[in-house]
Design a protein with these regions (language model features):
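Conserved alpha-helical positions within TPR/SEL1-like repeat arrays
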Residues: 18-29, 52-63, 86-97, 120-131, ...
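TPR-adjacent "capping" and linker segments in tetratricopeptide-repeat scaffold/adaptor proteins
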Residues: 2-19
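TPR/TPR-like (Sel1-like) alpha-helical repeat modules
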Residues: 283, 297-321
Length: 321
């Protein structure tokens, strides 16, 4: 029995739509997210019911910082295919980027109901738990992710982060070293290892690690600030001020950098500069407190109590700086 002309046209559209989806997926893997977004949109113009293309479009939008739109695309994918793991994972990621960690946790749970062997979902669940202050549970999730995918860089780093929040700094460093053994140029792992070494008061070792990080990402304000902090703690205040000035020229909103700058200038007898730096830090803190309180109250009204508590805790951290 021959295929009807109408059926043949629909079959060709579906094939072409899926081909554009594959193109978008490949472009996304190359980091070409604008081009990937266009390819996914072309796929959906040919086949609006292709759930994985909606999930792919959402992923591309998320990579471009358009998280609300990512959520909309993922919800469309889920309406077409409630078992689309990519859509649930991507929606959870976007919710996390918007600070909605309780909602992210629920997405991860739904993903794991569909696919209990999803390393990505276990890792994402760990992140959500960690952001809600449940660090031991985060470690357990990362352990499960690493059982499924032993070379999962993000899971090693997130596991280290959780150990750090529990003040188990030696264990934290071991995790970052495992990640760096897999990929020596992992900037985030180097920065976090530097912070762990600072917490252990190993300032010279931290400087070596932060210099490696800076060689990978030249002009990174955080790497420069942390190096400046180490130099200040070692009593090398002239060098600290030079480093902090570079950091603040790149990003003048790092309140902690202004605090360290104020301290080093004071130790050098540069009292006017010390006072100006302290004023800068105070001004930034006031804005952070105000925005944190507004966000926390908004989350309370939405019934997102765990996320609200986290926001208020961040405010308290600023006030106790």
């Amino acid at each position: 029995m021959s295929e009807s002309p109408e059926s043949a046209v629909n079959s060709q559209s579906l094939k072409s739509g899926y081909e554009f989806y594959l193109k978008g997926h490949a472009l996304g893997r190359e980091g070409r997210h604008e081009d990937a977004l266009l390819a996914f949109s072309q796929a959906l113009s040919l086949d609006p019911n292709l759930a994985i293309a909606w999930a792919g479009k959402g992923f591309a939008l998320g990579k471009l910082g358009r998280y609300e739109e990512e959520i909309e695309c993922c919800e469309k994918a889920i309406s077409l295919d409630p078992y689309c793991v990519d859509a649930w994972n991507n929606k959870g990621f976007a919710l996390g980027m918007l600070g909605r960690f309780q909602d992210k946790l629920e997405c991860c749970e739904r993903t794991l109901q569909i696919d209990p062997e999803s390393a990505t979902a276990w890792n994402n669940k760990g992140v959500a738990l960690g952001m809600l202050g449940r660090f031991e549970a985060e470690i357990q999730c990362c352990d499960r992710a690493l059982e499924l995918r032993p070379r999962y860089l993000s899971a090693w780093v997130n596991r280290g982060y959780a150990f750090g929040k529990l003040k188990w700094f030696e264990e934290e460093i071991i995790c970052y070293d495992r990640a760096l053994r897999i990929y020596p140029f992992y900037f985030s792992a180097l920065i976090k290892k530097g912070i762990a070494l600072i917490n252990l008061k190993r300032y010279t070792d931290a400087i070596d690690v932060l210099d490696r990080a800076h060689s990978i990402e030249l002009g990174n304000a955080k790497a420069l600030y942390l190096k400046g902090l180490c130099l200040s703690m070692l009593g090398k205040h002239e060098a600290a001020v030079d480093c902090l000035e570079q950091a603040l020229e790149i990003n003048s909103t790092i309140a902690d950098a202004w605090v360290v700058m104020s301290n080093s200038c004071f130790m050098l007898g540069r009292l006017e500069e010390s006072a100006r730096a302290f004023d800068k830090a105070y001004y930034i803190d006031v804005k952070d407190v105000r925005s944190g309180l507004v966000k926390g109250l908004s989350l309370l009204k939405m019934g997102k109590f765990d996320d609200a508590i986290r926001s208020f805790s961040n405010v308290l951290g600023v006030l106790l700086r």
